Curated annotation (Swiss-Prot):
Disordered: annotated segments: 1-21
Keyword annotations of the record: Plasmid
InterPro entries per UniProt: DUF5431 (IPR035273)
Domain of life of the native organism: Bacteria
Protein's name in the database: Protein FlmC homolog
Length: 70
């Protein structure tokens, strides 16, 4: 039976409680807003969050700089 404060039928470890996020090499905290169902992601590693333009081009995510909409 679920505990009275548990909102889901998933076990506590599957809901991402404390300690679950810190098991990976790059722990990222994900917080879901119950009202608007948006996700707020906080990156703990600045190497992933901040890349220069050359790294973005070689690793993907460079965009379409030559694309024109007519």
């Amino acid at each position: 039976m679920s505990s009275p404060h548990q909102d889901s039928l998933l076990p506590r470890f599957a809901q991402g409680e404390e300690g679950h996020e810190t098991t990976t090499k790059f722990p990222c905290l994900v917080c879901v807003d119950r009202v608007s169902h948006t996700v707020d992601i906080h990156l703990s590693d600045t190497k992933i969050a901040v890349r220069d333009s050359l790294q973005r081009r070689t690793q993907g995510g460079g965009g379409f700089h030559g694309l024109r909409i007519r």
